[in-house]
Curated annotation (Swiss-Prot):
Classification lineage: Bacteria, Bacillati, Mycoplasmatota, Mollicutes, Mycoplasmataceae
Biased composition (Polar residues): 580-591
Cited function: Acts as a chaperone.
Region (Disordered): 568-591
Domain of life: Bacteria
Induction comment: By stress conditions e.g. heat shock.
Extent of Low complexity compositional bias: 568-577
Name recorded for this polypeptide: Chaperone protein DnaK
InterPro entries: ATPase_NBD, Chaperone_DnaK, Heat_shock_70_CS, HSP70_peptide-bd_sf, Hsp_70_fam
Amino acid sequence: MAKEKIIGIDLGTTNSVVSVIEGGQPIILENPEGQRTTPSVVAFKNSDIIVGGAAKRQAVTNPNVVQSIKSKMGTTSKVNLEGKDYSPEQISAEILRYMKNYAEAKLGQKVTKAVITVPAYFNDAQRKATKDAGTIAGLQVERIINEPTAAALAYGLDKQDKEETILVYDLGGGTFDVSILAIGGGSFDVIATSGNNKLGGDNFDEEIIKWLLGKIKAEYNIDLSKEKMALQRLKDEAEKAKINLSSQLEVEINLPFIAMNESGPISFATTLTRSEFNKITKHLVDLTIQPVKDALSAAKKTPSEINEVLLVGGSTRIPAVQELVKSLLNKEPNRSINPDEVVAMGAAVQGGVLAGEVTDILLLDVTPLSLGIETMGGVMTKLIERNTTIPAKRTQIFSTATDNQPAVDINVLQGERAMAADNKSLGQFQLTGIQPAPRGVPQIEVTFEIDANGIVSVSAKDKNTNEEKTITISNSGNLSEAEVERMIKEAQENAANDEVKKKNIELKNKAENYINIIENSLLQAGDKISAEQKEQSQKMVDEIKELVKNENYEALEQKMAELEQAMAQAAEFANKQNESDPNNNSSEQNN
């Protein structure tokens, strides 16, 4: 019987993450939607309880949706849902129960124990409420630990021999926290905290939404600020644009059939540059300055006395935020671990310590299987082929997939399949600090080396900056000979199918996205379009649904091409009608 795991949970204001120790290292467990982070949102609908992304998607249309319940923990406030009062602990318990359940499904075993993280500033009542939420969810909470402590654990800073002062800059979806820790001899002491519990990534999204509403109003004289369906689509596009602007200098925002006017459907498209994004969100970035200064003052430290700066929270990916941190503290921040996941990983490390699972290196059995990395499009690129005699060393040059990409994620793989997802992941790390350049220009030197003892070292080096990161792996996953043979056989049998699979999945996702857009547009349009137009649109939707259902990808590809052409023509017609409408022009001039 497998030893019971102690999972680590980052119960966040906006998103939550669950991690567990596997082979001595923390891994993130994906939720049923295939996502590594789960929105901390709970919805009630006809007595059904919905958690995560499905609940978040109802936020605009369902009044019985609860978000950011973490801010109410430790208070006596209640939330009334479908006529019944619920405490913050009960709502948080639904999030924890959801994560517990999918952790059990992923691990294939019962999960009853957890380490849960809380902000360093949480008082006793808030900490007890968090523990109570875990108990309600059916979890024995082994430890409540501070989020900055968890981040330091994930970075391995507990192994430092000397005493150091660490600043953790945590800008999440809904809150901002700064913590300063004294670390030494395996102990962590939070010596100062500061922050703003009403500042986070959601605020950046809102600024993009306001910018988009203004652009649509100026171009079409239509106010969508009260249109729930349109606002939900604007929010989705704003969040995507914000994320993409962390690695791109500009993004295209396309909103087909976002509204209707006398001329017909309106398809809106615009470009948001990183420069414009920085301009409309500068006041938000600047709001993080004073809390950093306050924390330094409370800790009686100067920037030069800070040994390490850790970035936590997805919003720290924003380049302007990173630049601000660097200028404030005169130090390049450490962002080598995914900022969305680092706290949960630290909680898992603590759980691993309590369960006696944590070791210094990732253990894995060296087997006659190929070793490589995941490259663009989710493909596995092999560096050391199976049956290579050890010791062995192989080096290959790779590059970036997008313009001005600041970092590359190295996913170390073992197996014979063409697609990365079908192989075994042995470990992951990130090479950061890549200087802005067009895609394909930076030279990233990846080296695999296996010594006589079967210890695998994987390094990635930026040849321009000489920045380098390394992961050490030993004993490739405890694979038996039978498992090795099975993996080789599967690779041979699926070689052709692997190449087709990715293309079909992408096509299906694209089709389902268009179906959703058209159906929402028809619903929003109401009586603004003719019955004939509705019938034609619905007929096309039904045809696409049938093709998706029957997995007729060849016909689906042709139908999607026809749909895209029709949408482009509709958008062009609507824009021409708008340009030639004198009433619209005069109304714009009067605004």
